[in-house]
């Protein structure tokens, strides 16, 4: 709510999803990026700033249903593990990590660290297409092998994963059924 007296006179509104953006830096330069993230954007929120954001969500919600750690690309934040630990120490029912999957694909030990945050933890994995040309258009490079390797690691670790599609008419809209079946 917190007491804005908008839709609910009883102050019972709450956030079903809170998103914390921990950085602006990304290891991709996606043409479709709404966050204006890139490798040149070097800004990272400090651990103290992120903890203050987590505390504000908990103060507002009590026991938040879902907090998504996002960015930029949160897996390249130098304090990502400490940030996830800080989130797990709070009464948050479910934590989601929004990622393009590159680090998970390249670093199985990192993926193993992520798996220690289960069961109330999941990966929100960018997965737009099986077609290299569609990925080039949406993400600026063919990430087919990277996505498959990330999924291999996540499946090996039995880590809950949601595939997230940026859908663009005439680019990958013909694949939505195939992606749903694959998921």
Which residues fall in each region the model found?
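Non-catalytic membrane-proximal stalk/linker segments that position and tether the catalytic domains
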Residues: 1-6
């Amino acid at each position: 709510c917190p007491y804005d007296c908008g839709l609910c006179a009883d102050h019972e509104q709450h956030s079903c999803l809170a998103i914390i953006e921990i950085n602006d830096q990304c290891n991709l330069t996606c043409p479709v990026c709404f966050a204006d993230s890139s490798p040149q954007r070097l800004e990272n929120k400090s651990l103290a700033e992120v903890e203050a954001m987590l505390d504000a969500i908990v103060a507002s919600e009590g026991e938040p249903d879902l907090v998504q750690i996002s960015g930029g690309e949160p897996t390249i934040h130098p304090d990502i593990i400490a940030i996830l630990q800080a989130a797990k120490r709070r009464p948050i029912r479910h934590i989601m990590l929004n990622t393009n999957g590159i680090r998970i694909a390249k670093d199985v030990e990192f993926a193993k660290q992520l798996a220690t945050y289960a069961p109330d933890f999941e990966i929100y994995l960018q997965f737009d297409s099986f077609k290299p040309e569609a990925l080039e258009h949406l993400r600026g490079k063919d990430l087919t092998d990277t996505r498959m390797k990330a999924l291999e690691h996540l499946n090996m670790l039995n880590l809950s994963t949601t595939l997230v599609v940026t859908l663009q008419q005439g680019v990958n809209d013909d694949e939505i059924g195939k992606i749903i079946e694959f998921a």
